[in-house]
């Protein structure tokens, strides 16, 4: 059984995202003074007094206004309500009761869900009680004064919500974390459309206007018994085109989404090809050591395709993204669904490689084979590089420590050869791998190896 879900709703700019962040103990949704910053619904996990639940943050609800995005936001909020077991209705204690609050309360009363009213921005204890008293008029039970900024009243709010939620079996609460998949790319390459295709519903706002996803949006899905957390991110632009403000925070959030992911889907527009910004983004993924799949979207829109078209595209992409040549390529159409069914299988393969642990004996067999095929070149003084021993010291990404006579003797060409040999023999498709080089004399290497093996055995 999944964790119980609580939908957080309210009109724009009452502090819903700040409250969700306070409940979850993180700053995930973008918090800014501009109304309407949260456009999609964002999920966070909360733990309180031994109980675990999820909260879903929604965009600001406004009825009677069909301007750009508001119908989409209402649709997303209603979808969140359909999943939820209870609702936290957030109002602004400083501003007091408004006609928009009353309209929302009327709508909530017609929904088949219990509602708890959270009167946010009540920083003072006594004053907060007075501010909250005005909201009894909504007829939704006792209003709970709280402050998302300072944290007061949050415990009381959770205590008011918990009785409305089903108990969850411990084994369900202890399920392993889902695979985190960040969907990144430039604005308007089809990231949200791809997410919706993978989820099977219109989950993120899809619009031809670049930049319509402002937050890193998490969606939990399951495929063949495996859970995934899909993270749709704001499109990443060049710094010179980014104004300080919400878009700045969105791009920063997208980079953080890469950091908290297991694997990244780098979405490229088939019609535009690989741009400089795609290269920079790919570099960021490699730098962070994340598994990656290159997803070439809008393949249906490429005209005059023949049997050579994919090969030509592949060659160009490999040339321009040579530093992540280990990432598999998928040519898809989020619009028609072409080849999107292959994405989860590729994700599983990449994650398995990213988490792979190779026995020390196997590492050294591969090393000896590599040395037999091609010895390290000697320097001008005739001194030749020697590799005494190797072992894997880390995963995510796989990292190997090599004991050598002098790291400076191993130039970039030979290091690339060694990585290629490891990939050919150990199958690291979809993940970067790292080599660390340590200088050791032949006399000392035996002792260092024994010490390293002991530390690895104790893990």
UniProtKB/Swiss-Prot annotation:
Domain of life: Bacteria
Keyword Repeat: yes
SUPFAM superfamilies given in the database record: P-loop containing nucleoside triphosphate hydrolases
Residue ranges of domain KH-like in the record: 356-441
Residues binding GTP 2: 185-192, 232-236, 297-300
Annotated GTP 1 binding sites: 10-17, 57-61, 120-123
Keyword annotations from UniProtKB, A to Z: GTP-binding, Nucleotide-binding, Repeat, Ribosome biogenesis
GO BP, sorted A to Z: ribosome biogenesis
InterPro entries: G_ENGA, GTP-bd, GTPase_Der, KH_dom-like, KH_dom-like_a/b, P-loop_NTPase, Small_GTP-bd
Gene3D superfamilies, A to Z: 3.30.300.20, P-loop containing nucleotide triphosphate hydrolases (3.40.50.300)
Domain (EngA-type G) ranges: 4-169, 179-355
GO molecular function: GTP binding; ribosome binding
CDD domains membership: EngA1 (cd01894), EngA2 (cd01895)
Listed Pfam families: KH_dom-like, MMR_HSR1
Assembly with partners or alone: Associates with the 50S ribosomal subunit.
Matching HAMAP family: GTPase_Der
Family: Belongs to the TRAFAC class TrmE-Era-EngA-EngB-Septin-like GTPase superfamily. EngA (Der) GTPase family.
Its biological purpose: GTPase that plays an essential role in the late steps of ribosome biogenesis.
Protein's UniProt name: GTPase Der
Gene: der
